[in-house]
């Protein structure tokens, strides 16, 4: 998908230049909301990770957990997006509509642990190894995206709309998610298949670590 996006962008810009097609491209990075949050390795839903934390099972984070990431709540995205519509300044332009604050993956997970009153138990596994999974497609998510640190410039959108604001921090957004899930227990779907996969991968990874350590 990331390889296709530039070609699609160029197609629309060409339509604007040749025919006056009124295009405005908005790039949100990762958005999240009431029923989903930014996470590293997860199963069918985000709750699969939360459930492991609640059950005192270790969770998996790609790499060393130190790569940076922008997390944009859908409410904030919408507030700024509306100001880009019917705005003469934005026609024929592309914008980042992203929460300017960046955090590390470990910061996200540590805050989630704090909100759940649990002690962090994170297993860091290299992205290259995660991409070898035959059960889950981690190649696109990690090798193409999440393993890299991101830092976006929001000066352009700040210049062209009146009130650029991202007031929902990742801390507040995670708390909103947990509150929403408690109000909608039907969304707390168990994912036994993911749990078994995590446990198996963590066991194998610890065995590899021990073998390497014993033979260095």
Spans of model-derived segments:
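Glycine/proline-rich active-site loop of Rossmann-fold NAD(P)-dependent oxidoreductases
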Residues: 19, 33-48, 84-95, 118-119
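Glycine-rich Rossmann NAD(P)(H)-binding loop
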Residues: 33, 61-67, 95-102, 111-113, ...
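A conserved pocket-lining segment of Rossmann-fold NAD(P)-dependent short-chain dehydrogenase/reductase
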Residues: 48-72
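Short-chain dehydrogenase/reductase
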Residues: 1-13, 40-47, 70-71, 102, ...
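Mid/C-terminal beta-alpha module of Rossmann-like enzyme folds, strongest
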Residues: 83-142, 154, 176, 187, ...
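Conserved C-terminal active-site "lid" loop/helix of NAD(P)H-dependent oxidoreductases
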Residues: 74, 132-164, 183-186
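Active-site Tyr-X1-5-Lys
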Residues: 1-25, 29, 34, 54
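A conserved structural motif in NAD(P)-dependent oxidoreductases
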Residues: 70-77, 169
């Amino acid at each position: 998908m990331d390889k296709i996006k530039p070609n699609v962008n160029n197609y629309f810009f060409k339509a604007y230049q040749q025919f006056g097609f009124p295009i405005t491209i908005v790039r949100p990075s990762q958005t999240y909301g009431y029923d989903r949050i930014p996470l590293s390795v997860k199963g069918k839903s985000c709750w699969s990770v939360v459930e492991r934390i609640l059950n005192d099972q270790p969770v998996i984070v790609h790499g060393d957990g130190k790569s940076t990431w922008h997390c944009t709540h859908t409410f904030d995205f919408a507030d700024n997006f509306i100001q880009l519509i019917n705005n003469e300044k934005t026609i024929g332009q592309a914008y980042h509509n992203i929460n300017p604050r960046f955090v590390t993956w470990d910061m996200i997970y540590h805050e989630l642990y704090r909100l759940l009153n649990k002690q962090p138990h994170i297993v860091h596994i290299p992205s290259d190894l995660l991409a070898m999974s035959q059960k889950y497609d981690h190649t696109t998510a990690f090798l193409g995206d999440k393993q890299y640190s991101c830092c976006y410039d929001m000066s352009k959108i700040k210049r062209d709309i009146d009130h650029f604001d991202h007031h929902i921090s990742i801390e507040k957004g995670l708390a909103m998610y947990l509150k929403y899930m408690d109000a909608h227990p039907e969304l707390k779907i168990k994912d036994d298949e993911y749990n078994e996969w995590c446990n198996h991968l963590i066991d194998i990874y610890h065995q590899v670590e021990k073998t390497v350590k014993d033979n260095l």
